[in-house]
């Protein structure tokens, strides 16, 4: 009987995740303009597309609003999103670096045991879609969730699931020592794709940032 219950929960969880992913990644965005750049194309979209947040859509497409395109932040945004383009182009090279240097393993499926109410609040991200679940040191799964019932992409929290204790825990101190620059930690620390993009864009000086700066991923 217990095995049937466990199997049923697993099936329900898988269906729930598929529905969330289908809805989020089904392209509802209207492209208003296109600009060709040496490394890809920028598509200008309206503010309803991913709530106006810049993101990548393919290995060669960056999307942003007109207001971001003409703002003083444009170069910084493009630098950040260009890192995501490279992550899409060379996924195995980045995964290998995350695994060997940062201790991360990326997976398509969530670690076993995460309660459905957390999975229902999962906040998907186009820039991490190749492996949205990031498990650090084989124990801590980082993932972003909507903060409230409004499910706004701009209002999220990052949860840390302890695979061994089977519960949500605080950010491990050892993680902070490696990934934070003193008291300055990456803003989007839910996934190494976002951590790497922040490091390259904002010139962090944490041990993890130094590892990235010395890697072939940055020097090539």
Predicted segment positions?
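Hydrophobic alpha-helical membrane-insertion segments, chiefly the h-region
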Residues: 15-22
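N-terminal Sec-pathway targeting helices
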Residues: 1-14
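Short pre-active-site segment immediately N-terminal to the catalytic Zn-binding motif
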Residues: 63-78
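Short, flexible loop/turn elements at secondary-structure junctions
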Residues: 48, 66-68, 83, 87
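Metalloprotease/metallohydrolase-associated module, dominated by Zn2+-dependent proteases
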Residues: 99-215, 220
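Catalytic Zn2+-binding segment of zinc metalloproteases
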Residues: 82-98
